[in-house]
Amino acid sequence: NTKYSFKLFVIFDTGATGDFKFRHAGPSSPTLVRIRRHHIIGAGTAYAGIAIDTAYSSVDVAVAGSAGPGVVEMDGIVHNGANAGNFEFQWAQNASEAVDTTVRAGSYIQYRAL
């Protein structure tokens, strides 16, 4: 039944068609989820996908664009219910391509109990 706040910052590189996809997940039946998220597509210059989520992801969020670096940022609060488990950031390359999508060292999740 712990309450948490968190901040996530992910830097990735992707090829022209591989792109990036992600979702957030956690223990079932939280009592509160409020997550602000946005991203910059590969080689982009402006935020996109700006949203406030009130539940964990039910589908992947695709970050499709051009080859190059991109960013995903999230922050929020989670009030966990009675079920144990971890908050997770899950990611993958969105489409098959010869160039691997890479999450760069220095990407992070910070959290604290409230």
Named regions from a protein language model:
Residues 1-114:
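Surface-exposed molecular-recognition determinants
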